[in-house]
Amino acid sequence: MPRNQGFSEPEYSAEYSAEYSVSLPSDPDRGVGRTHEISVRNSGSCLCLPRFMRLTFVPESLENLYQTYFKRQRHETLLVLVVFAALFDCYVVVMCAVVFSSDKLASLAVAGIGLVLDIILFVLCKKGLLPDRVTRRVLPYVLWLLITAQIFSYLGLNFARAHAASDTVGWQVFFVFSFFITLPLSLSPIVIISVVSCVVHTLVLGVTVAQQQQEELKGMQLLREILANVFLYLCAIAVGIMSYYMADRKHRKAFLEARQSLEVKMNLEEQSQQQENLMLSILPKHVADEMLKDMKKDESQKDQQQFNTMYMYRHENVSILFADIVGFTQLSSACSAQELVKLLNELFARFDKLAAKYHQLRIKILGDCYYCICGLPDYREDHAVCSILMGLAMVEAISYVREKTKTGVDMRVGVHTGTVLGGVLGQKRWQYDVWSTDVTVANKMEAGGIPGRVHISQSTMDCLKGEFDVEPGDGGSRCDYLEEKGIETYLIIASKPEVKKTATQNGLNGSALPNGAPASSKSSSPALIETKEPNGSAHSSGSTSEKPEEQDAQADNPSFPNPRRRLRLQDLADRVVDASEDEHELNQLLNEALLERESAQVVKKRNTFLLSMRFMDPEMETRYSVEKEKQSGAAFSCSCVVLLCTALVEILIDPWLMTNYVTFMVGEILLLILTICSLAAIFPRAFPKKLVAFSTWIDRTRWARNTWAMLAIFILVMANVVDMLSCLQYYTGPSNATAGMETEGSCLENPKYYNYVAVLSLIATIMLVQVSHMVKLTLMLLVAGAVATINLYAWRPVFDEYDHKRFREHDLPMVALEQMQGFNPGLNGTDRLPLVPSKYSMTVMVFLMMLSFYYFSRHVEKLARTLFLWKIEVHDQKERVYEMRRWNEALVTNMLPEHVARHFLGSKKRDEELYSQTYDEIGVMFASLPNFADFYTEESINNGGIECLRFLNEIISDFDSLLDNPKFRVITKIKTIGSTYMAASGVTPDVNTNGFASSNKEDKSERERWQHLADLADFALAMKDTLTNINNQSFNNFMLRIGMNKGGVLAGVIGARKPHYDIWGNTVNVASRMESTGVMGNIQVVEETQVILREYGFRFVRRGPIFVKGKGELLTFFLKGRDKLATFPNGPSVTLPHQVVDNS
């Protein structure tokens, strides 16, 4: 399955729209829809059909899956066919009961048995009591045989001595067409059984009638009637094939939509899951939840807030661990900067594994310092034990680096237990951090510790309950802060033998590393020295399996809602990691999704009105009504076929009636006009634009569609009615019956065929897929009502004369001709008719078929509305997933630079994998608030320090808001360290200060290359002005101490599992020293930086040489400002937060 692991790419825009297109062959816009690797081949098993109607999916596995899906969809329609069969049995029972006699007993018994069998089959199918294999493969043929047997039984038993070529032809036509719209079989078997049924029915009727007529055989009349039957059957089969094709095409599109929607949702869900995992690897879950909740607030709600949102929480009784690499300077001198970063990356990745094992929350990585907390966010009683075990494991882990690198590196670990304020400050580049006096103590515990030992405070000692042997730490002798505060310290000697047992009892082994190795396993040590690959990426010799925290991140999270389905999409995404290579796996997932979708009863009574089936929600009904049905032109073409077959049948019955030819020509022309107007919207390139616009308007306007459909059926009905009324010219009344019936080729020879033509009109009506079932009911009532009116009134004597002649020819008991003009069931003895008069039986047949087709139309509309709701549901789910993905994306890109986040949202990264980029010319800035430490107190008036941090959050947030200015778009906030703000310029890859794709350095002048450094200097000045505005409004006197430098750095991420973006290099070290050795209220730079910035109009004051640790004497300057004429030559002026504009 193709995957796109980036952010909002353009090609996804179409997939989030409400109109999701799927293209099939013969679509006018084929090639526009997204079919990915799926194609539809114009070939199939039914070779008798035109090539464009033979659709087959490629690959074959998908076609097999579709056939299974299609047959499942037709399972309900199989029940419809059972209902049809039951109605036919009821018809036979009524017809026999009305004129009951002893010779009707057999026919009545067979019909009764058939009705019972139909009811049993209905119950078995409805309740799902039959195996699927039987229901889909055996039951359709059983039902076909049962219906065929019932038709022949009725034919043989009910018309035993008076057969005619028209007997049961109407029912045969009805069921042949029903096979195509209900049986869950492929098209070829349906065509075969339909042809077999029609051939056998025709042969049986022809032979039987010929034998009964014997010496009085009317060969031409029988031949014409047999040919009329054939054309009726051919029409039913042709329209049935078209209906099957239309249903197949509709279901294929629904199937492709389901597959592609599943694929899109899996892509989105997987990306959203990656974003969530990445986010939760940087932020604790409770903080991320609160951030997402606030991000979804309306702008009006945000504007009502007096202060910027601060996500800060108090956590008591936690253990804080600080660990620092001793001898890091010696180690850094032994390898290059890139090799050093790679080494740190592998070492800290190992520490992250240990942190997961010992329930630690890694807070930050500061250079070579690693610190974490246990008991946050979820409290643990054994937090102190876990932290000490973590410290011991870190000391042992660094020993392997010491052995392999032959250097004196070691770990100095300090642990303190107390209270912290945990959260994030500012509005950009969020990083979780903790603040409190106890954090400071923990930091000093590390600074006052001894290399290779774990140094703990008295508060931590009080939580241990004797699990470890300790000795006095005497931390005050090595750290003035500890001595000043009078903090007793201890050094862990070694864990007792019971420690392992204690750790097990405390659940440590429950979250051990997946490979089950102990923290000091030597199996992982080679990875710590395999860091000198020339391509700049580090790899471990072993594979990395699923991590505990990754499993935790995948737990149910109410802030990251997934579609509320039994088959959760994140489960699908997890199970189809390599779906592009494993088509079978994706098809299995699709099958599960389709099964679940079918099992969900989407259309319920509470959603739709019972009678009309319209949605109760008017807006939903409007959306459904404008759904475009592209097969409407095909439906009108079926009307043309029906009219053609109608004309052929009527011409065969009465070849001398000129009205037949006139109605056919006029009706066919009118129907062709309607068909062309409907096809114009489907094939816009083949028709004039005005006709296409008119056709499109018809398709999208409900009343116009209904009117167009009514016109088509009205034409069919009127053609039949006009022919029936015109035929009356041959009939001159009962007195001239002999002469009237002697006219060979008259429609009076067999008036039943005009009712069979009405059945074709009913079939044409249900083919109108663009109208609702209520409109179809209206049209079918028009057809049935017109036929019934003519049968019972205009053609009443015609049918009576037909019955009279038929019974007379076969010497059957009958009433006098004058008595036949009014059917009276009260007649007895030999005067009782052996059959129900044709005028009644034909009328009942037409109405019963109308009811059957109406029942089927309701089923089709229910299915159409269900598919519509599924489509809306899929769209809404994709929108929800996409919306959550957008919020996750916003959070992730607010924690990592976008190009870095893209990298980590790709395929799963190994823990030791290093992402890094080298930059030769960037600017680095550190800006601190030295006097904030004096401002911070944890007194109750300040809510334990939270209010002090709230004020710091306002300052940092205002600094962050400066970055929204286009002038500072090339400036990247790296992080905040306490009250120190770190930023860099020029670290955005492939983009220069003007926002265009960068070219080679040789193609740009020095002024162009260092414009970003000037922007960074402007940013530092804007920060000073912003702080001045804050001081004026809050009556404070905070001052910034800023240091800047320029040069080359290595930017990258340490720890693929918990990515920490940072920059390293001598440039960063010097910039940090410029800040720490600077003077409050000033921006200090070295001479090389001053020379470059001076060219941009910045003013400097020479400070002179100062001593910098590790660098010796450096000549420095204070940046005082910029000439007004040179201010922001390439951008607009900057509006400062909290700026008070003087308009006087």
UniProtKB/Swiss-Prot annotation:
Name this polypeptide is given: Adenylate cyclase type 3
Cofactor note: Binds 2 magnesium ions per subunit. Is also active with manganese (in vitro).
Any GO CC annotation of this UniProt entry: membrane
Disease implication from the record: Obesity: A condition characterized by an increase of body weight beyond the limitation of skeletal and physical requirements, as the result of excessive accumulation of body fat.
Covalent cross-link Glycyl lysine isopeptide (Lys-Gly) (interchain with G-Cter in SUMO3), where: K465
Activity regulation text: Specifically activated by the G alpha protein GNAL/G(olf) in signaling cascades triggered by odorant receptors. Activated by forskolin. After forskolin treatment, activity is further increased by calcium/calmodulin. In the absence of forskolin, calcium/calmodulin has little effect on enzyme activity.
Chain positions with Phosphoserine modification: S525, S580, S1076
Lineage, uppermost ranks: Eukaryota, Metazoa, Chordata, Craniata, Vertebrata
A GO term for molecular function: calmodulin binding
Ligand binding (Mg(2+) 1): D324, D368
Organism field: Homo sapiens (Human)
